[in-house]
Structures are given as C-alpha cells and as structure tokens.
Amino acid sequence: MNSERIIKKYPNRRLYDTEVSRYITLADVRDLVMSGQPFRVLDSANDSDITRSILLQIMLEEETGGQPLFSANMLAQIIRFYGGTLQGTFARYLESSLDLFAKQQQEVTKALTDNPFGTVTRLTQKNVEIWADLQDELMRAAGFPVAPRKKKE
C-alpha cells in the first residue's frame, strides 16, 4: 500500500491533497477510505490532525442519504458511553468487533470457494471465543469478577 497521504483543510473549508496537488471533495476522501489508502487530514492553520472530524462528516453524509447504518437508538446508546467509566473499553470493543467482522468477511469470501461448511463452522467457533473474551473484558472493566475460561484445543 502507498505511504500516508496528507490532506490539508483550509479556512475556506476546502481540502487540498498534497500528493496530487489539487483540491478534493469529501467524496474523494471517501474514495480514499474505500480503497484502503492511509491518509491524514491536517488543519492548515496549525497542522493539528482533524482526520476524525472529516471521517465523521463523511459518515454524516452517508447516514443522511440512502439507507442509514445506525439507528437513532444505537446512536443514543453510543452517546451514553461518552464520559463514562467504560468509554475506553467500549471504544476498544467496537474497534475489535469491526476488525473481526472485516477479517471474517474476507475469510468467508476467500474460503467459501473451498469448503463452505467447514469455513462457517470454524468462523462460528472463532466468533464465539472472541465474543466471550470481549465480554470478559467488559465485565472486568465494570469491576465484576471473571472466572478463567478453558480454551478448547
């Protein structure tokens, strides 16, 4: 994959891609995300990293057009984690869950051509183990005792 692209955001709200030396749109940034191209967006005034803010703008545009990914209830539940004792744990949980989902999506696509039933069984077992580990982490973070699990061989 290519090196990290730097995009500058100027006070006039325009985005400038320093790699291709031209102004780009949020749709272009979305294309970078979809292609897996690493990038950072920097505020031109002070070089602060505003990548998350730009990604949230893209998500907002996606959510307002077409079929939304998040329900209002789901968004409200996520907001309730801000400032709480489990905010960091919840963030790691979401990131781990998304990473797992993406990896499994790739594995399923690749493996279904070989042995569909064996693949689904193996992924299901792996999924159960990962969810159990994440549940244990949440319980520990909340201060509940967690009994050690026996790992299947």
Curated annotation (Swiss-Prot):
- List the InterPro entries hit by this protein, alphabetically: PHA_DNA-bd_N, PHA_reg_PhaR, PHB_accumulat
Q: Which organism is it from?
A: Allochromatium vinosum (strain ATCC 17899 / DSM 180 / NBRC 103801 / NCIMB 10441 / D) (Chromatium vinosum)
Q: Which domain of life is it from?
A: Bacteria
Q: Which GO terms describe its biological process?
A: regulation of DNA-templated transcription
What name is this protein filed under?
Uncharacterized protein Alvin_0064
Q: Which Pfam families match?
A: PHB_acc, PHB_acc_N
